[in-house]
Amino acid sequence: GILDSLKNLAKNAAQILLNKASCKLSGQC
């Protein structure tokens, strides 16, 4: 459903942000 799609989008966005943050913190960008 729509709610499931939104939840998946939110999860993906959060994962991308976490990856970018950890990348910057570790200096491996």
Curated annotation (Swiss-Prot):
It comes from the Eukaryota. The keyword GTP-binding does not apply. Pfam families: Antimicrobial_2. One of its GO terms (cellular component) is extracellular region. Expressed by the skin glands. It is found in: Secreted. Transmembrane segments: none annotated. GO terms for biological process: defense response to bacterium. Signal peptide: none annotated. Disulfide bonds join C23-C29. Coiled coil: none annotated. Keywords: Amphibian defense peptide, Antibiotic, Antimicrobial, Disulfide bond, Secreted. Antimicrobial peptide. Belongs to the frog skin active peptide (FSAP) family. Brevinin subfamily. This is Brevinin-2Rd. It comes from Pelophylax ridibundus. The lineage of its organism: Eukaryota, Metazoa, Chordata, Craniata, Vertebrata.
